[in-house]
Amino acid sequence: MITSTSNDRVKRVVAYGQKAKARREDGVFIIEGMKMLREAPVLQVSEVYVTEKFVDTASEGDKEILWRYGAETVSEEVMNKMADTQTPQGVLAVIRQYPYTLEEVLEGYNQSASGKENAPLLLILENIQDPGNLGTMLRSGEGTGVTGIILSKGCADIFSPKVIRSTMGSIFRMPFIYVENVSEMVKELGTKGISTYAAHLKGKKSYDEFDYTKPTAFLIGNEGNGLTKETADAASEYVLIPMKGEVESMNAATSAAILTFEASRQRRG
């Protein structure tokens, strides 16, 4: 059992939770809780830590999973130190990052798993800063059939603990890549036959007036400033989400969910 918060392994795990640089250098991230561990791809699980208290009350199935991964027992104090949450669940794991390619983003996890070929449905996110928004977009994206997500370098770190929690497990099933130049990527997608729609207050047509049954990508911008002009202008069309009252625009994550749900609705026929 690890009982010292000064232990080198503990310090390393703490760094993974607190520093994007540490996660990036070692190609890992942290998850908490048994539910997330169950959903993690086996080959991506690197290390597992658990408290005696959790083991004492765990089901036989959960114990089997923990021992299969060679879980290391730690004291409550150590778990509190390593965990990002205020009230840790008693299970924490170090997960290897998976390096997706653009091809995997276009193809999508769900299509690969089902063997069905559907038109790509993408989210292109520019400078999304709020971890909760980013995690929610992954989760709602999975639920609405998004095949993959393309992020600008200015977006929040997708591997931060807050983003990971917000995905509710979708982090393991939603292909994504970061790109240096979003507007250039939008243009590249156009050469691949993918129509790109920028969520924008200057849109002349409502989002539900377009056909999204063909290869489609939605562009969502920063929570406060929206899309940069360069990126918005690279899109095939501007789309507007009509609002009532004095509300000017939707939350970024809500906008993404509305647009991708409409695409999902159309594709259901």
Per-range role (PLM):
Residues G143-T144, I158, V163-I171, K229-G269:
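Structured adenosyl-cofactor binding patch, chiefly the S-adenosyl-L-methionine
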Residues M1-S59, C155-A156:
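Boundary-proximal intrinsically disordered activation/regulatory segments immediately upstream
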Residues E64-R96:
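Glycine/small-residue-rich loop that forms an oxyanion/phosphate-binding "nest" at active or ligand-binding sites
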Residues G108-K202:
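RNA substrate-binding interface of SAM-dependent RNA methyltransferases
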Residues V74-S75, E126, S152-K153, P175, ...:
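Short beta->alpha connector loops at strand-helix junctions that form conserved
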